[in-house]
Amino acid sequence: MSEAFMGSGRLPAAFMSPGPTSFVDFLRQVSPDRLPNFANLPSDSSPAHLTPEATTIVAVVFSGGVVLAGDRRATSGNVIANRDMDKLFRTDEFSAVGIAGSAGIGIELAKLFQVELEHYEKREGRPLSLEGKANRLATMIRSNLGLAMQGFVVVPLLVGYDTSRGEGRIFSYDPVGGCYEEHRYHAIGSGSVYAKGALKKLYRDDLAETDAALVALQALYDAADDDSATGGPDLHRKIYPLVDVITEDGHRRMSHEEVESLAQTVVAARAEHPDGPTAPVS
């Protein structure tokens, strides 16, 4: 334990005075040993077997907000490491993150980001703007650059409802912390190429919430159809993708029953048309 916490048992002075708005910066000053630290990994280590890979995440903007959906599969090489992983994280009332890449590090990053936003709101008395959240996450990803260069790459997808603009927004990242706003829809992970093809074909500007969720599930189904690392609906085990919805009313996770109904609609339609719904030529 850090020396800052040893002694009389009372909180050190740093905890009793105004500090940085970033929880990560505060912890780095007061007790850096409590931050995730993998700096001493050997440079010639092979990380592939150490942590499963989280795979495909999609996001779709609709008229009242934004939908974030993720498949449940995690892989380790050619092995299915987990069939029911949760890759979506509510980060505050109006934002959420989906992770692809090194699962263990991605989950820790998402949870630390949750604390980061909570710390800022307590410290400042107001939440960060959505763009502020996007930039703060970019800084945290950048601090993972050393690990990314050793193969532990984490690529999150941030979505949120911008209360100042009254719309859903999507932000993607590269492994070195570059932040890019995406418009209408986006996908990340091993199946993202196939998911984006479906999103491009099915997206409409006037989508309602349920339709946006259905489009996201169709995109994940297409990804699973061509990418073995992406899991499709598992009807026998009743394992379905997870879907988060963020609107002016805040964040909510669609219930298992809601997603099950939508997933069964997708699967039933695929029995008739295995390649999925078609888009008009003109």
Curated annotation (Swiss-Prot):
One of its GO terms (biological process) is modification-dependent protein catabolic process. The lineage of its organism: Bacteria, Bacillati, Actinomycetota, Actinomycetes, Streptosporangiales. It is an enzyme of class 3 (hydrolase). Pathway: Protein degradation; proteasomal Pup-dependent pathway. NCBIfam families: 20S_bact_beta. Belongs to the peptidase T1B family. This is Proteasome subunit beta. The formation of the proteasomal ATPase ARC-20S proteasome complex, likely via the docking of the C-termini of ARC into the intersubunit pockets in the alpha-rings, may trigger opening of the gate for substrate entry. Interconversion between the open-gate and close-gate conformations leads to a dynamic regulation of the 20S proteasome proteolysis activity. Residues 1-54 form a propeptide. The keyword Nucleotide-binding does not apply. Its EC number is 3.4.25.1. InterPro entries: Ntn_hydrolases_N (IPR029055), Pept_T1A_subB (IPR000243), Proteasome_sua/b (IPR001353), Proteasome_suB-type (IPR023333), PSB_actinobac (IPR022483). It is found in: Cytoplasm. PANTHER family: ATP-DEPENDENT PROTEASE SUBUNIT HSLV, METALLOPROTEASE TLDD. Keywords: Autocatalytic cleavage, Cytoplasm, Hydrolase, Protease, Proteasome, Threonine protease, Zymogen. The gene is prcB. It comes from the Bacteria. GO terms for cellular component: cytoplasm; proteasome core complex, beta-subunit complex. It catalyses: Cleavage of peptide bonds with very broad specificity. The keyword Methyltransferase does not apply.
